[in-house]
Amino acid sequence: MELKWMNTHLTQAEQLIYNNQVTEGLELLQNLLYEEPGYAHLHNHIGWAYLYYTPDIAQAEMHLKLSIRFNPTYAPPYLHMGNLLIRSARYTEAVEYLQKGLHQREANKVAFLDLIAQVYELKQDFRKAIRFYKEAMVATTGFETAQLMEGIKRCRKKRWVMFSF
């Protein structure tokens, strides 16, 4: 369920946060919880703000999990949870969230596949990382291709270095 009146406020909060008024943006988002405490998009925005604009990872995780709980088919919180878990070196959990999100309707497949590849790269499973970078390349016709190619090259170099000595 999407609430148009709420989306106006979510956009306002985003603009405040982008303009380095993080406290004001978060305050607006928190106040909206009184109106719609079970709105997945709202919890996703709050989790996004805490994850990328504050050091409070616990709040980010809580709100992203609430977003998924309130709407399990909404893809963005899975992507943000993947990022959060990668930052926390919780790679197994990250892959689980990213795999679930990848299969949601309207998921940004390239972003999910790219993050899954990064997890495998960090776990030093370079073959799997390369496989996911390639899958991401197949899923795009856009600007991401160069970045994904760099990921493949980087994994090949790391694999060569790890196994040549």
Functional labels for PLM-detected ranges:
Residues 5-35, 51:
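Alpha-helical segment of the N-proximal tetratricopeptide repeat
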Residues 42, 77, 111-112, 145-148:
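TPR alpha-solenoid repeat register
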